Structures are given as C-alpha cells and as structure tokens.
C-alpha cells in the first residue's frame, strides 16, 4: 500500500499560482493515464464505500464525476450529480458556499435524486476548505438523507477542511499535503 501511495504522489503534478496567484494546484490527470494507479484509487474508495454501507454516491463536478462514475459502476450504487447552476433540469435544490479562491458559489441537485439513496457517501478529488462538501451535506440533509462517509483522493491540510466535516462521519483520504 505504501508503495502505491508513493506512486500516486509522484504521478500528481504541481503548478504554482494556478488558477490564481498564491494557489498551488495539484493536477491529478496523470493518474488517469495510468490504469494501475487509477484502479488502486478506485479499489481504496470502493472498499470504504462498502465499509460505511452507503447506498448512494454523491459527487460534485467536475473531477468528482470521474471518480463517482467509475465507483458507481464498480459498487453498483446510484450516482447523484451535484452541479453548478443551470446544468441540471427538473426541480432543483440549491446551496451557496465559498471556495478557497472564490466566494458565493452555488451548487444544485435534483430534488428527486436521493429518493433511493438514504445513506450517502460524498466523493471528490480534493478536500480543501470543505466549502463544497458542507454545501453538499446541507443538500443531502434537506432532501431527507444522511451523509455516512466522505472520500477524497487529496486533503490540503493547511486549509483545515477536515475539521469542518461532520465529526461523526467516517472519512477516507488517500494523500495528505
């Protein structure tokens, strides 16, 4: 496991001042070019999803969709998409939140998306300030379901996002920076 995590770390490229000055961007796209590394990530996440007995996978766009779609197929669980405004049709629930480098962002989810998902795991590539996750938590609760797990490839520890997650909800993070 340690060797795989080291290989994951080596695969991730770092870019200073992207997308804005002062931000260190972790580019995970090289992982998708290596099927062995990507499969390792999916196996770790799928095992966690089974451990928390989730019955649905909730993920935000865009990179969350990459993991969420693959995990939904692997675990045979429904995939619930959380998107930016005006990307989903139907009746929507929306939540405002702040990002590390942008304020007053909005996420939307179809109000019928969780009808068969009462125990949700939130999957995304990165945990930074936890603004996105907190907004998704609120949407899940508002629609009558609960978050039973958080699953991320990377945590940016200096932003203290993990401290803002629900304290009694299991968390899986593969890499910590």
UniProtKB/Swiss-Prot annotation:
CDD domains: PRTases_typeI. Its EC number is 2.4.2.7. Keywords: Cytoplasm, Glycosyltransferase, Purine salvage, Transferase. Pathway: Purine metabolism; AMP biosynthesis via salvage pathway; AMP from adenine: step 1/1. PROSITE patterns: PUR_PYR_PR_TRANSFER. It is found in: Cytoplasm. GO terms for biological process: adenine salvage; AMP salvage; purine ribonucleoside salvage. Its main location: cytoplasm. Pfam families: Pribosyltran. It catalyses: AMP + diphosphate = 5-phospho-alpha-D-ribose 1-diphosphate + adenine. One of its GO terms (molecular function) is adenine binding. One of its GO terms (cellular component) is cytoplasm. Catalyzes a salvage reaction resulting in the formation of AMP, that is energically less costly than de novo synthesis. NCBIfam families: apt (TIGR01090), PRK02304.1-5 (NF002636). Homodimer. Belongs to the purine/pyrimidine phosphoribosyltransferase family. This is Adenine phosphoribosyltransferase. The gene is apt.
